[in-house]
């Protein structure tokens, strides 16, 4: 029996990195952020819906059906807007949506119907759609404007987009640019979503100081005016093309969650099978900005094509730092994503409460599976597998470290309360003898399988266990 023991050293840097990112972008509570109260996702959704405007489903229908069309000529509102809205005097010159605008508008509509129970039907050209689209040239309405569903029928469903010699962002909307973001934003208005705060383009000179709550930024809502940097994120010039975390929560409060969307095994990022441009990475320079809505299956965030150091968090309502951006990927409330794949940088991967598959890839990665019997691959490089609670790899449902390399990889137990606050000292033995803190390291050379088992309760049974493909030594265990 070995009598070697490892003395308490305090929480490691790897554990601290995990703990810090688990609490990064935290929301709610009583503290002010940037001088504003912090809202939870649910509070933000209620704020976005404060006007209580919505379309009504037909009696007995579980799905709202709305038609849409692209105007080919000015309608009555365009010709005499002052009859309907006193602060709009002239919209200038009308122009119909181009083929590019129409195609991108349809993608924006699709992104809304993916997350909620709305079915959009193409009514063709003209003004016969419930929702209509057109361009104007005067700057009186800002870059675009639209009407909530609580207005008179003469205005309901209309959205208008500025195109003139000094403003061209709406000419060529595309995934990740401001034109596509504008389409998704204005469609959100026509469906019942307001700005998160009481501001409008063309009404004074609003700034982030006018926000009602801290998370009123483009990191959380496509309906916001304010840059994501205000809340610590950075998209490096990219914009969301689809509803984000708070928008999804809001629209689902109005029309329900679409539980038919992506019910199979779905991959987001590289090797995406979503058939959605905003969920798909096509090169190492792709700038992803999205919030995952997924109704089932065994799903994966694949960021294997990026070389930057990434931080990936699989918990619902959490934000991740992906592809050199900060806080650019989130997971909507109620969504479970099972798996994550890192890139060639030194990544931090955080699992959730189900059985996750985490693959670090190249680089010196930190993997934290959380609860559930997780399958963890560190990949090439010196990797650290972090644990913060004995329940995260119980004897009944142990994690498996699939490619452990002794002398290079580490099993980090420094965050376990028994070591940090309980003063427990780890002692390696050949067999349990009823003393808390005893640990058994085993290895079978024929199968190349090893294990670590620890008795924390002193009942001569393992409370904590990890299976390994590879052999671990005492020097590989960090406490």
UniProtKB/Swiss-Prot annotation:
Main localization of the protein described in the UniProt heading: secreted
Source organism, top-level taxon: Bacteria
UniProt keyword list: Calcium, Hydrolase, Metal-binding, Metalloprotease, Protease, Repeat, Secreted, Zinc, Zymogen
SS bond list: none
UniProt-annotated catalytic positions: 186
One MF term in the entry's GO annotations: calcium ion binding
Residues that coordinate or bind Zn(2+): 185, 189, 195
Class in the EC hierarchy, top level: hydrolase
Signal peptide positions on this chain: none
Keyword Coiled coil: no
GO biological process, any: symbiont-mediated evasion of recognition by host pattern recognition receptor
NCBIfam families, sorted: Zn_serralysin
Annotated protein name in UniProt: Serralysin
Organism this protein belongs to: Pseudomonas aeruginosa (strain ATCC 15692 / DSM 22644 / CIP 104116 / JCM 14847 / LMG 12228 / 1C / PRS 101 / PAO1)
């Amino acid at each position: 029996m070995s009598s070697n023991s490892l003395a308490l050293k305090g929480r490691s840097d790897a554990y601290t990195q995990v703990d810090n990112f688990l609490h990064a972008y935290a929301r709610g509570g009583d503290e002010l952020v940037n001088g504003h109260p912090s809202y939870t996702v649910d509070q933000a959704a209620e704020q976005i819906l404060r006007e209580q405007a919505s379309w009504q489903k037909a009696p007995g229908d579980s799905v709202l059906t709305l038609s849409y069309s692209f105007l080919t000529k000015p309608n009555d509102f365009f010709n005499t807007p002052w009859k309907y809205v006193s602060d709009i005097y002239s919209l200038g010159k009308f122009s119909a949506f181009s083929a590019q605008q129409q195609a991108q508008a349809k993608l924006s509509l699709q992104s809304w119907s993916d997350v909620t129970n709305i079915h959009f039907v193409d009514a063709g050209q003209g003004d016969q759609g419930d929702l209509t689209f057109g361009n104007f040239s005067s700057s009186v309405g800002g870059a675009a404007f639209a009407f909530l569903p609580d207005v008179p029928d003469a205005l309901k469903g209309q959205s208008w987009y500025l195109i003139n010699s000094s403003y061209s962002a709406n000419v060529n909307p595309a995934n990740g640019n401001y034109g596509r973001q504008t389409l998704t934003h204005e469609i959100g208005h026509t469906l019942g979503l307001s700005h998160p705060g009481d501001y409008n383009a063309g009404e004074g000179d609003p700034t982030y100081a006018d926000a009602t709550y801290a998370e009123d930024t483009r990191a959380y809502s496509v309906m916001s005016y304010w840059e994501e940097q205000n809340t610590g994120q950075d998209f490096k010039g990219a914009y969301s093309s689809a509803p984000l975390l708070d928008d999804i929560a809001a629209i689902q409060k109005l029309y329900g969650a679409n539980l038919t969307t992506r019910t199979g095994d779905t991959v987001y990022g590289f090797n995406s099978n979503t058939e959605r441009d905003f969920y798909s990475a096509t090169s190492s320079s792709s700038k992803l900005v999205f919030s995952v809505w997924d109704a089932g299956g065994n799903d994966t965030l694949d960021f294997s094509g990026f070389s930057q150091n990434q931080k990936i968090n699989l918990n619902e309502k959490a934000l991740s730092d992906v592809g050199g951006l900060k806080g650019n990927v989130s997971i909507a409330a109620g969504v479970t994503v099972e798996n994550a794949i890192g890139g060639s940088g030194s990544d931090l991967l955080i699992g959730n409460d189900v059985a996750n598959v985490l693959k670090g890839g190249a680089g010196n990665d930190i993997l934290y599976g959380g609860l559930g019997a997780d399958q963890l691959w560190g990949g090439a490089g010196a990797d650290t597998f972090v644990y913060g609670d004995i329940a995260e790899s119980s004897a009944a449902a142990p994690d498996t470290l699939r490619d452990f390399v002794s002398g290079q990889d580490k099993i980090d137990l420094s965050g376990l309360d028994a070591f940090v606050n309980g003063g427990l000292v780890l002692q390696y033995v050949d067999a349990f003898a009823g003393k808390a803190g005893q640990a058994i390291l085993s290895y079978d050379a024929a199968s190349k399988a090893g294990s670590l088992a620890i008795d924390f309760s002193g009942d001569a049974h393992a409370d904590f266990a990890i299976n390994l493909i590879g052999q671990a030594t005492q020097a590989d265990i960090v406490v």
